[in-house]
């Protein structure tokens, strides 16, 4: 059990919240840098167990962009709304896929089933990610962020912690872990006012 929950236990830092808003990533506008992705599997081909959120282990992901072309990946589990944040040093597909594979690889097998992403160029090497993690990637329709509703909602919550125009290169992974812990310890109406952390613990028991 300890090995399953080690990624939940990170130190919590203080003074994280701010009322300012986060800059929207470039991937959400018409000049997103999206392009044709080889061997892309459409979100429309996702099985029913993903659509109805019945089975844990299916994730939604996105790349947030800050000042000076800095980036953070957000990962939200659809069943529990559990959130992970990953600092990304560069936006090229090799760097992004490697960072995501490393983070997903920390999870127990039952939490590694699928990932839904938009059609940004950073996921061109999605097959490499799948080989490394055994996690299938599904791609949203162009400019359709609502198809990753849990992820979009979480990105909105993150605006309370990360100021608009922040240079993410100045933010440590430990700081991101603390923000994620705050989100995961917040009761959610959609979860019957349980927390994502509690829901995930129940899955792992």
Segments and roles (model prediction):
Residues 65-69, 85-109:
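Active-site beta-loop-alpha junctions of metal-dependent nucleic acid enzymes
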Residues 51, 64-84:
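Short conserved beta-strand segments at catalytic cores or DNA/RNA-binding microdomains
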Residues 62, 75, 81, 100, ...:
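Mobile genetic element proteins and their domesticated derivatives, centered on retroelements
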Residues 56-65:
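Two-metal-ion RNase H-like nuclease active-site motif
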Residues 120, 130-137, 141-205:
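Charged alpha-helix within mobile-element recombinases
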Residues 1-51:
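Basic, flexible linker segments flanking DNA-binding modules
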Residues 110-123:
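Acidic/histidine-rich, metal-coordinating catalytic segments
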Residues 49, 57, 165-166:
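Glycine-centered loop/turn motifs
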